[in-house]
Amino acid sequence: LMRKDDLTTGPMALHFRTLAIPAAFGMLFTTLYNVVDVYYAGLLSTDAQAGLAIGYQAFFILMAVGFGLSSALSTLVSNAKGSGNAAEAQRYVVQGLAFGGVITASCMVIGWFLGPELIVLVSEPGAYRDAAMGYFYWLIFALPGFLLAYGGNGILQAHGDSRSMQRALMAAFIANIGLNPLFMFGLPGVWSGMGFNGIAAATIISQTGVMVYILVRIFRLEVMQSVQITAFQPDKDSFRK
């Protein structure tokens, strides 16, 4: 089983440090991750950089759902654990993952149709809008990686683990440095690459890796060891909470 910190015992200062420092490093590497994308887009053109910024604006609206999911799951699971109700904590973890899957699929469908309309709303016709459209359509497929990873991180934080997300984001940053040029420019004599959309492809792979790692960490939690597959069937009462 994975290491976990019990937030119901011990000094508050220790718990603040346990949660805050890894979270701060995770945010740092998220910023650096985006800097890498901007840098490689700049190797193509300023239109590519503008398209990156505009396409990501539309995507961020969808990604914000992940922040809400993280806060909700962290609160619900933490309250259940704090009250000593292991069964309720398990139910919130399982149903939280199920809800995350449902909301992710919904956001992908909604984003596919409404995202381009948002891009049109904030841009003028031109090369940078075309770049933003292509980038956004590809980036939609990274949405599960973002939403389920952030939602899952809320579950891990409720168990005192904010290190897993930090490590995952650090690894994603390093992977992004290598994946961006690979997908943008390809391999000489083998593959010509995807151009600007290669940035989105690199994001899909690296963020999906983050999601897989976070889910693996969740399923190694003690609370998940007795879970049956039928427990993941969506429950309306749990979803309402």
Predicted regions and their residues:
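Hydrophobic/aromatic residues in alpha-helical transmembrane segments
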Residues: I21, V36-D37, L73-S74, L114-G115, ...
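Alpha-helical transmembrane segments of multi-pass membrane transporters/permeases
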Residues: G100, I155-L182, N197, I204
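Residue-level hotspots within pore-lining transmembrane alpha-helices
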Residues: F25, F29, Y33, L62-G66, ...
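Hydrophobic transmembrane alpha-helices of multi-pass small-molecule transporters
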Residues: I61-A64, M108, N176-N180, M211-L215
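Short alpha-helical transmembrane segments in multi-pass integral membrane proteins
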Residues: L1-A23, V77-P144, G189-K241
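Signature of the first transmembrane helix
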Residues: L14-S74
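Small-residue-rich hydrophobic transmembrane alpha-helices
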Residues: Q49-V109, F146-M165
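Helix-terminus/linker motif at the lipid-water interface of multi-pass membrane proteins
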Residues: L32-A50, I119-G126, L182-M194
